[in-house]
Amino acid sequence: MRCPYCTGESAVIDTRELDNGETIRRRRRCKHCDRRFTTYERVESVNVMVVKKNGDREPYDREKLLRGLRVAAYKRPISADVIDTLVTEVEAALIAYDALEVPSSVIGEQVMERLRSLDEVAYIRFASVYRSFSDLGKLREAVEELMEKE
């Protein structure tokens, strides 16, 4: 595999199974620049169309969900492996949904359900984008709802 920093060849220095053997995590070292990076291998199994709020349809994109979660978890004590596991759990729920099309609301609720117990700040950050809070009052309501459920 090519190094993402210098495009040199890399060597695998560590391999581990994650998610009960569904994912393989590999640590690699570039033979040219000596930098290290991580790659993941998994079977691409979620083949559904996501129905957006406005009715548009687009293919499910794991990377898009990962990006959204990374933004929500920015500077929070949540590792990349935990975020990856959360996305894998959401994908398992999508497979169990057993439909060719899944509303984006199903994905959003699955993520929020898991984030709530993982990290409250990341939950509020994700909810503020997912639920499109239009003002501070809506954000306050979400925080109060979260505090009531404790």
From Swiss-Prot:
Residues 48-138 form the ATP-cone domain. It comes from the Bacteria. GO terms for biological process: negative regulation of DNA-templated transcription. The keyword Transport does not apply. Disulfide bonds: none annotated. GO terms for molecular function: ATP binding; DNA binding; zinc ion binding. Keywords: ATP-binding, DNA-binding, Metal-binding, Nucleotide-binding, Repressor, Transcription, Transcription regulation, Zinc, Zinc-finger. A zinc finger (unnamed) spans 3-33. Pfam families: ATP-cone (PF03477), Zn_ribbon_NrdR (PF22811). InterPro entries: ATP-cone_dom (IPR005144), NrdR-like_N (IPR055173), RNR_NrdR-like (IPR003796). Its cofactor is Zn(2+). Signal peptide: none annotated. The keyword DNA-binding applies. Binds 1 zinc ion. Negatively regulates transcription of bacterial ribonucleotide reductase nrd genes and operons by binding to NrdR-boxes. Belongs to the NrdR family. This is Transcriptional repressor NrdR. It comes from Herpetosiphon aurantiacus (strain ATCC 23779 / DSM 785 / 114-95). The lineage of its organism: Bacteria, Bacillati, Chloroflexota, Chloroflexia, Herpetosiphonales. The gene is nrdR.
